[in-house]
Design a protein with these regions (language model features):
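Formylglycine-dependent sulfatase
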Residues: 1-407
């Protein structure tokens, strides 16, 4: 009876808030948005919550994050493009002191605040500054300060304001972020169970590089062998069947710079790129499942508002061989060698199968064209392919209208 009474009491309190963001994930990359990729945990939230068909971001990593956290146009925050200094006004590339974050506001109103994931709101990534998460309202932080990096040996991995403990042999960033987020919920429940919390969980997945454990990649072997043309058609039909788009909406033409699948010579390598990307998305979903399990275990699930979105559409960037060979010191994205001393093969090379720590590749325009089905263009562009994102909201005791919201 005590546990039932405790759960009932908690249900009447202010809701906890968990805000989850994917990185460079396309509109149709979740199962509940028509994908072949397995995302059971997000699909479950969508089934019991609300999915939006017309939710938008700002088409780039940093501006989307700045707007999400402040409620402002990105230029007002100082993040007009990315985190390099492009001049005065809205382009200094660092979140300024003329805005407040949702963490600062909620913290002032009695919420515990925590962040686990990718920050990417300042170019000063190696030394703490007033633009770091711990100085913008988050009481605790674990993640990367920069905008990208290895999933096995992430550069700028930070706990609080100090370099985090070195990754062990089993380290995989997406999974670790899920564990760290669940750990925050567990520790908070023990320390201050009556206090609501705000947890910001911006994953780096599935942003390049294409990194995923081989055992997960293998589970997608053959799934993408029919190629991007056929798979775009299938996703388009599933989006119609799911009532996310109108059946009068045609599928956009294949990008003019993408060759027909029937003309592709290196199909095995191309399929491998998408297999790895799919593994990254599924592992993010699994990490979200870890967080959901902890919410249920602590009795907080029903009174937690969970929101999920992506920062922009699928990314068409092709990483040329040697693209990051000219590294700053200290490096921003990746180290030249793995922890075992193996040289990292940087760039998209059809002789190198992506996935392992000694690779650094992207899935490129052909597969981004699939990710953004049914739309044109990609991250960077303000066409629908760049700015349309899945959005899922779930709050069992809140007054959310379930189903698909087209408004």
């Amino acid at each position: 009876m005590n546990s039932v009474s405790s759960a009932s009491t908690r249900s009447r309190r202010r809701p906890n808030v968990v805000l989850i963001m994917a990185d460079d994930m396309g509109y149709s990359d979740l199962g509940c948005y028509g994908s072949e990729i397995r995302t059971p945990h997000l699909d479950g939230l969508a089934a019991d919550g609300v999915r939006m068909s017309q939710f938008y971001n700002t088409a780039r990593c940093s501006p989307a994050r700045a707007s999400l956290l402040t409620g402002l146009h990105p230029h007002q925050t100082g993040i007009g493009v990315l985190t390099h200094d492009d001049g005065p006004g809205g382009y200094p590339g660092t979140i300024n002191d003329r805005c407040v974050t949702i963490a600062e506001v909620l913290g002032d109103h009695g919420y515990a605040t925590a962040m686990r994931g990718k920050w990417h709101l300042t170019g000063r990534v190696h030394e703490p500054s007033d633009a770091w998460p711990t100085r913008r309202g988050f009481e605790s932080f674990y993640g990367i300060v920069a905008g990208a990096g290895s999933y096995y040996q992430p550069v700028t991995l930070t706990r609080g304001e100090e370099p985090a403990e070195p990754p062990d042999d089993d380290f995989y960033l997406t999974s670790r972020l899920g564990d760290e987020a669940a750990g925050f919920i567990r520790d908070h429940d023990l320390a201050d169970p009556d206090k609501p919390f705000f947890l910001y969980l911006p994953f780096t997945a599935p942003h390049w590089p294409l990194h995923a454990p081989e055992e997960m990649i293998k589970t997608y072997r053959g799934v993408f062998d029919d190629g991007w043309d056929e798979l775009r058609e299938r996703r388009h039909q599933r989006l119609i069947d799911l009532e996310l788009i109108n059946d009068k909406w045609p599928l956009s033409e294949r990008d003019s710079e993408v060759v027909a699948w029937d003309e592709v010579a290196d199909r095995d390598w191309q399929a491998r790129r998408m297999e790895t990307y799919a593994a990254q998305v599924e592992l993010m979903d699994a990490a979200i499942g870890t967080v959901l399990d902890e919410l249920r275990r602590t009795g907080r699930f029903d009174n937690t508002l969970i929101m999920f979105l992506s920062d922009n559409g699928g990314c068409a960037e092709e990483i040329p061989p040697g693209w990051v060979d000219e590294l700053p010191n200290p490096p921003l994205h990746t180290r030249p060698r793995t922890s075992t001393g193996e040289r990292v093969r940087r760039g998209n090379d059809s002789t190198v199968r992506p996935g392992g720590p000694a690779t650094y590749a992207s899935y490129g325009k052909p597969w981004a064209n699939l990710s953004n089905t049914p739309f044109r263009e990609y991250k960077h562009w303000v066409h629908e392919g760049g700015i349309a994102t899945p959005f899922i909201a779930h709050w069992p005791i809140g007054e959310l209208r379930s189903g698909v919201d087209h408004d």
